[in-house]
């Protein structure tokens, strides 16, 4: 799998996430894929680790029900062998509070047999916490 193929698969997964299409997201993952969102659980209750299609479906369904990705852009991508590091910018809206924020994340992706076998996302827990707060405090 070359760089272009890997970025195409990653892009398909991101596009499905923006659409809120859980099954479309699952289509780019292997059946035993590991999926991790790394965050401090006390600050952002979306920290999670899953393995396999059923666990990923449950987690992704919960994420789609909680956070709407209004826009997602790939800023940088580094591909080496079967691995990729992707920096993305996301406009996110909390479906619980209506709060909106723009943030960036770093996604580490590993491929096997043309699909994502491991996906780890690092994101700003302060932004996630702000999105989930019932009333956001604005600093002046």
Map each language-model feature to its residues.
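A beta-strand edge to alpha-helix "cap/lid" segment located at domain peripheries
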Residues: 1-5, 64-140
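Short, low-complexity N-terminal intrinsically disordered segments enriched in polar/charged residues
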Residues: 1-31, 137-140
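A solvent-exposed, acidic/Ser-Thr-rich amphipathic alpha-helical stretch
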Residues: 3, 30-81
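Hydrophobic alpha-helical core bundles mediating ligand binding, dimerization, or RNAP-core interactions
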Residues: 10, 14-17, 29, 60-63, ...
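Hydrophobic pocket/interface hotspot
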Residues: 13, 25, 33, 52, ...
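Phosphate-binding glycine-rich loops and adjacent basic patches that engage nucleotide phosphates
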Residues: 17-27, 49-50, 68-72, 92
């Amino acid at each position: 799998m070359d760089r272009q193929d890997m970025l195409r698969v990653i892009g398909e997964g991101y596009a499905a996430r923006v659409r809120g299409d859980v099954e479309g997201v699952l289509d780019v993952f292997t059946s035993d894929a590991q999926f991790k969102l790394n965050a401090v659980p006390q600050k952002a209750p979306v920290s999670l680790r899953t393995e396999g299609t059923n666990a990923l479906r449950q987690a992704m369904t919960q994420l789609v029900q909680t956070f709407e990705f209004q826009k997602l852009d790939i800023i940088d991508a580094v591909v080496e062998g079967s691995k990729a590091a992707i920096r993305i910018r996301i406009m996110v809206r909390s479906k619980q509070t209506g709060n909106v924020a723009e943030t960036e994340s770093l996604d580490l992706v590993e491929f096997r047999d043309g699909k994502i076998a491991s996906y780890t996302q690092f994101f700003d827990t302060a932004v996630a916490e702000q999105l989930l707060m019932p009333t956001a405090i604005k600093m002046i």
